[in-house]
Design a protein with these regions (language model features):
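Key DNA-contacting residues within the recognition helix of helix-turn-helix
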Residues: 6, 31-32, 49
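DNA major-groove recognition helix of helix-turn-helix/homeodomain DNA-binding modules
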Residues: 41-61
Length: 66
């Protein structure tokens, strides 16, 4: 899962800090979630999905996180 999130984030040219800001969490917290140490909350998954779609990546939430 984590490699997919990182891959899509890199594909759209965003940093971990930018995604952390999008989610309203610290960069450290985001890094732990992307590394699979902590889980993303449902609302965070939805925000990431919406941002990727806004940036032209047309995929489902399950393709990103599962």
């Amino acid at each position: 899962m984590t490699n997919k999130i990182r891959g899509y984030r890199n594909m759209v040219g965003k940093t971990q800090k930018q995604f952390a800001t999008l989610l309203g969490i610290t960069e450290t917290s985001y890094r732990l979630k992307e590394a699979g140490i902590r889980e993303f909350k449902q609302n965070e998954m939805k925000r990431i999905h919406s941002e990727l779609q806004r940036l032209g990546i047309n995929i489902s939430i399950s393709e990103i996180f599962f």
